[in-house]
UniProtKB/Swiss-Prot annotation:
NCBIfam families to which the protein is assigned, alphabetical: greA, PRK00226.1-2, PRK00226.1-4, PRK00226.1-5
Protein name: Transcription elongation factor GreA
Record-stated family: Belongs to the GreA/GreB family.
Gene name as annotated: greA
Lineage: superkingdom: Bacteria
Organism, scientific name: Francisella philomiragia subsp. philomiragia (strain ATCC 25017 / CCUG 19701 / FSC 153 / O#319-036)
Amino acid sequence: MTNGRVPMTPAGEQALRAELSRLKKTERPAIIEAIAEARDHGDLKENAEYHAARERQGIIEGRIKDIESKLSNAQVIDVTKLQANGMVIFGATVTVINVDTEEETTYQIVGEDEADIDNHKISVVAPLARALIKKEVGDEIILDTPKGKVTYEIVDVEYK
């Protein structure tokens, strides 16, 4: 994350581009139409439809600017094209075992916007991801959690 660049996987970039396209081609025109319709209803001071549409327009325009900024600062990293030699890096899929409970979990380390714990995608800035970066299979990490220290062993690293 040097030079203001934001790391992102190719899938993360694709998802942002799809959202941006939807906002510009579908959402923006629909809200412009809704504002025009609400304006036709007369007095704008007491026109709830108009004010709601304007508020929605502000939200959409804000999100468009946010996505455009993220894409312009994105450093797309395709982990399949890197020579990491078994080391955990951004984009890697890492399988760990909780040493105490023997519970095995697999995570992919992704950009902040891509993080989705339900799909086992953790942000590169998350404490677990930061602890895993530059480690290899067989290494153990100790993570401070609200319930105390947890030790994980890295059992697999994939680049997919």
